[in-house]
């Protein structure tokens, strides 16, 4: 990531900086979480599309902060209520953000300790993503195709790209995700 995003902002590189992301988020945890959830769902990505490159990825200077320039919607999305957000804020007020951010900080360790990660998955697999998930932008330069995903699985049973859905797939489209999961489980003989 460091070489690809040398000249522009990339959230995973920003999260590597100990204490910086924590400080930014914890200044106003409710607003920080609200912006994060609302900017990476389908509605937020669509609202930001005029400020984003064609591959759905925000273009900011490499020294920008995470929340800089984020769209601030006036209403909650259908999948998130004020009570949901209050609960999440309370949880992070108790635990802080270091743990979740350390997941990003430990990525390089994964490659050393888990060399098998470069091998295709052998088990039957199901891949569900939102067509507007920004993660697809840096992995595939847009919405992935089945062929791009199949390279990583020996038995990709189900591939589904959910239209108008962003990063929070199961929250944004719970009925569709549940239907697809049941279809996948049925196809592999689960009862």
Report each predicted region and the residues it spans:
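Flexible "cap/lid" subdomain of the alpha/beta-hydrolase fold that forms the substrate-access gate
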Residues: 1-157, 161
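Catalytic active-site module of serine/aspartate enzymes centered on a nucleophile-bearing elbow/loop
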Residues: 153-191
